[in-house]
Amino acid sequence: MAKQPNLLIPVNRLTKTKGRLQTFLSEEERIHLTISTLKTVIEASNKAGFITAILTSDKDVISLASDLIVIQEKQELKGLNEQINSALNEMAKDEIVIVHADLPLITAKSLIQLKKASLQTNSIVIAKSFDGGSNAILLKPPKYFSAEYGPGSCAKHHNSAITAGLSATVIDPPELYLDLDTPKDLQKLLATEIGRKSPAGKYLIKIDAIKRLKEANFLDVRGEV
């Protein structure tokens, strides 16, 4: 019997991806950036030894993930949280990780670190984003979890876990700290050498994003992007 997936990557429709970047990047550029970070997340998951599943309704994403398990979104469900809660029923029952698809610096090591942060059952570990989101969550087990993604989701997930009697831990490894939603996020990525050398960083440099950031006054404290 095939093993059930234990890491879930939700992926929005590519034509709807990165809406907060639509005044900064063209649709084609936003799609390319999304695919770039998705490939980075998939690679990290596979190298860390997870059985990866993609949650999506996008045919192009399904084609891209042809060698992975695909859980198709259900039309009758509304919003990301309902889709994730439903998808968890099709996955492993003892331990699951949920990871955003837009983490440009994620590594296998950071996912293993997330896993090691939970040394007991009935626990949740949240990798917090710099703006208070939940970039990655380990659920051990997932049966007590209800997704609350959106603004401030890290605090919401943490508080819900405590209320449910679970052990809750928040970590902030640099590889899981940054997701790409806004021009400011692109600036944060391109302000570091490791960010510029990432696949997403290389693509952004290729399309002159640094010049665009400077023109839009997205500068760091050194006056550089």
List PLM regions with ranges.
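Short phosphate-binding loop-to-helix
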Residues: 67-97
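A short, N-terminal amphipathic alpha-helix
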Residues: 32-51
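N-terminal nucleotide-binding beta1-loop-alpha1 segment
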Residues: 1-21
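Active-site acidic Asp-centered loop
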Residues: 99-101
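Conserved donor-nucleotide/metal-binding helix-loop-beta segment in metal-dependent transferases, i.e.
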Residues: 106-132
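Acidic donor-binding segment of Leloir-type glycosyltransferases
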Residues: 49-71
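Conserved alpha/beta core of the MobA/IspD/sugar-nucleotide pyrophosphorylase nucleotidyltransferase superfamily
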Residues: 159-225
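Short, glycine-/small-residue-rich phosphate/pyrophosphate-handling segment
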Residues: 139-161
